[in-house]
Regions:
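Histidine-centered beta-alpha loop that forms part of the nucleotide-sugar donor binding/catalytic region
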Residues: 113-114, 137-140
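Conserved alpha-helical substructure of the radical SAM core
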Residues: 2-132, 147
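Active-site adenylate/phosphate-handling loop in enzymes that bind or generate adenylated species
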Residues: 143
Length: 153
C-alpha cells in the first residue's frame, strides 16, 4: 500500500480549498480560546497556568464576541473551524460555544493534549461529534513525554 492510499482527507477537501482560494473565500479559521493550559510543553507559546492567566490577564474574548466573529466568518463562507488554546477544554464556556458553533454548521476540529477527555467529554462528542480531534503526542514514551510536557505521560 502506498502513502497516497493512506490519505484520510477526501479529494473533495482539496477541491474546496483550491476553489475557495481562487474565489478569496476564508474556508478555514482558528479560534485560540485561551492561553491557559494544564501542561507546560517546552516548545509551546500558549501554556499559562490558571494563576498566570488571573494575574496577567490579556483581553480574552467572551462567548458573545466569539459567536459574533463566527457569524461573520460563516457569512463569508468559512466552513472549517479549529478550536485551540492553550487547552481549549479548560475554557469556561467551551461546551456552550462548541454547541453553538456546531449548530451554525462549522466542521470543527479540536487541538487538545487529551488529558481532560473523560466519559463526560466522550458523551458530549458522541452527541455532537467534531470533524477531527487532534491529540498531541510529544514523546516516544512516558519519560520523554514527561520531560517535554512536564505532565504525566
Amino acid at each position: 500500500m502506498e502513502m497516497k492510499d493512506l490519505r484520510v482527507e477526501p479529494k473533495l477537501t482539496g477541491y474546496l480549498f483550491s476553489k475557495a482560494s481562487r474565489c478569496k473565500v476564508p474556508l478555514s479559521g482558528t479560534f485560540e480560546l485561551s492561553p491557559e493550559c494544564n501542561f507546560r510543553c517546552g516548545m509551546c507559546y500558549v501554556r499559562k497556568t490558571h494563576q498566570e492567566v488571573q494575574c496577567h490577564p490579556r483581553a480574552m474574548l467572551t462567548i458573545d464576541q466569539w459567536v459574533a466573529i463566527a457569524k461573520q466568518a460563516r457569512a463569508e463562507g468559512m466552513l472549517y473551524l479549529l478550536l485551540t488554546g492553550g487547552e481549549p477544554l479548560l475554557w469556561p464556556d467551551f461546551w456552550e460555544l462548541y454547541e453553538i458553533l456546531s449548530k451554525m454548521g462549522f466542521l470543527i476540529s479540536i487541538n487538545t493534549n487529551g488529558s481532560l477527555i473523560d466519559e463526560h467529554v466522550v458523551e458530549k462528542w458522541k452527541q455532537m461529534p467534531p470533524t477531527r480531534i487532534n491529540i498531541t503526542l510529544y514523546g516516544a514514551g512516558d519519560q520523554s513525554y514527561e520531560r517535554l510536557c512536564h505532565a504525566k505521560g
